[in-house]
């Protein structure tokens, strides 16, 4: 139990934020939002599954890259498959990250009153209690740009950009009756890994084959915003989408001008119900 709590506490400090417009709150808002978060967790499982490469895909890539030298191909295949199997064993020996994500996201929605926030000046405060019910919720989306740059060497070097844009759901925002907007999202960080294998040919030539593999890492993040006045969540998630997709804070800053926004870090869970610096707002 202590380790379980430590894992949750360890995930919280790395907090930051991540368009489906929501309508008015339903009569059973809490259960609706809980179900939506379960769906979000399941969607993450799908993303992870799509990001993993099967042994067959690894073999096909290696075969294509090394078709000119069959003996080197065979050696590289062996290295790639062995590495893939080793990675699988390593992952299986650790805790189930997907299960932890689901447990964590449900723990958050079932224990809002345990969230401890840090206000300006470092004050610790609990802003959500059992009486502060969920008002509404909506999915957060983000445009993902895929840039394809082509370099040409003429009299002057220049680039041609070809952008492909996709929209994907990356999280969920919840609003509360006291003006709190809680953002639960996941971040995807791409990391290119190099797996190398080498073999010596009959003619004493040393060749090295390198496979580039992109690995996606997904992590859960929390962020909270406190407004003096509750307002429709569609306005919030629209501004958030514009900020994250287009690197423009204009709409988000307008929320501050209209409703006096305060950004809050979630720094802890109040497991022992220890005292905090301020009372609930």
From Swiss-Prot:
Subcellular location as annotated: Cell membrane
Record lipid sites (N-palmitoyl cysteine): 24
Main location: membrane
Region (Disordered): 145-165
Compositional bias per record (Basic and acidic residues), positions renumbered to this chain: 150-161
Span of the signal peptide: 1-23
A GO cellular component annotation in the UniProt record: plasma membrane
Lipidated sites in chain (S-diacylglycerol cysteine): 24
Assigned keywords, A-Z: Cell membrane, Lipoprotein, Membrane, Palmitate, Signal
Taxonomic superkingdom: Bacteria
Listed PROSITE patterns: PROKAR_LIPOPROTEIN (PS51257)
Membrane topology: Lipid-anchor
Record NCBIfam families: MPN162
Protein name: Uncharacterized lipoprotein MG149
């Amino acid at each position: 139990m202590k380790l379980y709590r430590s894992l949750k506490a360890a995930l919280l400090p790395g907090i930051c934020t991540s368009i489906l417009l929501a309508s008015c709150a339903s009569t059973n808002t809490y259960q609706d939002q809980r179900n939506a978060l379960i769906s979000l967790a399941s969607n993450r499982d799908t993303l992870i599954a799509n990001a993993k490469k099967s042994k067959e895909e690894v073999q096909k890539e290696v075969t294509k890259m090394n078709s000119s030298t069959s003996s080197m191909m065979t050696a590289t295949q062996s290295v790639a498959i062995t590495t893939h199997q080793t990675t699988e064993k390593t992952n299986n020996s650790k805790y189930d990250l997907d299960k932890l994500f689901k447990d964590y996201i449900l723990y958050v929605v079932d224990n809002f009153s345990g969230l401890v926030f840090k206000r300006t000046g470092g004050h610790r405060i609990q802003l959500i209690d059992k009486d502060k019910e969920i008002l509404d919720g909506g999915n957060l989306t983000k445009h993902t740009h895929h840039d394809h740059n082509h370099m040409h060497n003429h009299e002057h070097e220049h680039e041609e950009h070809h952008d492909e844009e996709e929209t994907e759901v990356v999280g969920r925002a919840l609003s509360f009756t006291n003006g709190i907007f809680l953002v639960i999202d996941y971040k995807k960080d791409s990391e290119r890994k190099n797996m190398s294998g080498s073999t010596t040919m009959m003619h004493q030539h040393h060749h090295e084959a390198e496979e580039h593999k992109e690995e996606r890492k997904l992590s859960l993040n929390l962020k909270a915003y406190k407004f003096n006045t509750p307002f429709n969540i569609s306005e919030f998630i629209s501004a958030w989408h514009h900020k994250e997709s287009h690197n423009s804070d204009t709409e988000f800053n307008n929320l501050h001008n209209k409703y006096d926004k305060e950004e809050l870090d979630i720094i802890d869970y109040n497991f022992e119900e220890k005292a905090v610096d301020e009372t609930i707002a």
